[in-house]
Regions:
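A compositional/biophysical signature of low hydrophobicity enriched in polar/charged and small residues
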Residues: 1-352
Length: 352
């Protein structure tokens, strides 16, 4: 069971995910000893899973693909097993709403989107009924949860949506969205990829601990981390907490069709939300995933509907979610395995 002090620590982590115990202590007004004890307890109880690196996939020679699968309920377990077997799955969760089935995020080698389509086409007529793919056009934006707006005694959130909506009108749309960076895969080696793997598992571990896990020196780890940071290989750090920390939060997904200026407005505005969210600009507009109080869904939905040509809404079953650590096993001799055999046949061949 968490208390207000625990929530204060989680909020501080969201603002400074890699902050030292001393930095978190200063931000929360607690002692370093108290922070250490409470962080340990949060991990032991499962309230705080980890702080995980969100990677900039294009830098790694990978193309992110937002995927929505229409599938009958009886097929979902088998479909999830196939997603688990696929070497380039990054995330999956069951969803209900505009699409009923599964939402998945893939990060496939550049120019292999047709092979991913082949994989999904093989499932049509049997496991799934249809699917939709979308690819990002620009860099992603994020927000982290701020429990300062959560009253634990009342189990109630307070957020001024009217002020947030007004911010859309004054957003600076003259500032372009971040461009998708070019690949730096040729400047990376398998040790770099193993560093990234460990950072997706838990980025708050000490550098010497991660270095020992990989089998490199702390100096090599520090030097390569400097390179990875300078080249934006790591896009963000997400604080992964148990959804039960606040019972009044549900993850909703919105596929919004709108013009580029509206995408800019919402991409900027979502970064100011006190809830964990991700916005991915797409060719049609943008895709947003946000964990918000269900009672606030009509408010956010109405704001989106007023400004977008079309809004497709879904909600997810967090109990079924699976987040995959970055896997260097598909990398060999300077490139990713991009064969149909590896991305389709092997996956389907081992299906139950």
């Amino acid at each position: 069971m968490v208390d207000d002090s625990d929530l204060n620590i989680i909020t501080a982590l969201g603002k400074n995910p890699l902050g030292t115990v001393q930095e978190i202590a200063r931000r929360t007004g607690m002692t370093s000893a108290t922070i250490s004890i409470r962080l340990k307890k949060l991990r032991q109880t499962g309230a705080l899973f980890s702080v995980s690196a969100q990677l900039t996939y294009p830098v790694l020679g990978l193309e992110p693909v937002v995927t929505f699968i229409e599938a009958p309920f009886k097929s979902l377990s088998r479909l999830e097993a196939l997603f688990d077997r696929h070497p380039y799955t990054r995330y999956r969760v069951r969803c209900v709403g505009y699409y009923n089935g599964l939402y998945g995020l893939f990060a496939v080698p550049e120019r292999t989107l047709p092979i991913l389509r082949d994989f999904l086409d093989e499932l049509k007529g049997g496991i799934i009924t249809d699917y939709r793919l979308d690819t990002p056009t620009n860099g992603w934006t994020y927000s982290e949860v701020d429990y300062n707006l959560y009253d634990m005694s009342k189990d109630q959130w307070s957020f001024d949506w009217a002020t947030w909506e007004a911010s859309l009108d004054v957003a600076n749309i003259g500032v372009p969205l971040p461009k998708l960076p070019n690949s730096l895969l040729r400047r990376l080696d398998v040790k770099d990829l193993r560093i990234l793997e460990q950072l997706t598992i838990d980025a708050r571990r000490k550098g010497k601990q991660i270095a020992a896990e990989i089998g490199i020196t702390p100096y090599h780890f520090t030097r390569r981390m400097q390179f990875l940071n300078e080249n934006r290989v790591i896009d963000s750090y997400r604080v992964i907490v148990d959804k039960g920390v606040s019972r009044l939060v549900t993850t909703f997904m919105f596929l919004c069709h709108c013009d580029p200026d509206e995408t800019k407005r919402f991409a900027t505005a979502f970064t100011t939300l006190p809830f964990q969210s991700t916005v991915i600009p797409t060719h049609q507009g943008f895709f947003a995933q946000a964990s918000i109080p269900p009672l606030d869904l009509p408010i956010l939905g109405s704001i989106l509907q007023q400004r977008c040509d079309k809004v497709e809404c879904l909600w997810s079953d967090y109990r079924s979610s699976m987040r995959y650590y970055f896997w260097p096993g598909a990398y060999c001799d300077g490139s990713w395995n991009a064969s149909r055999e590896f991305m389709v046949n092997t996956v389907l061949g081992g299906a139950a």
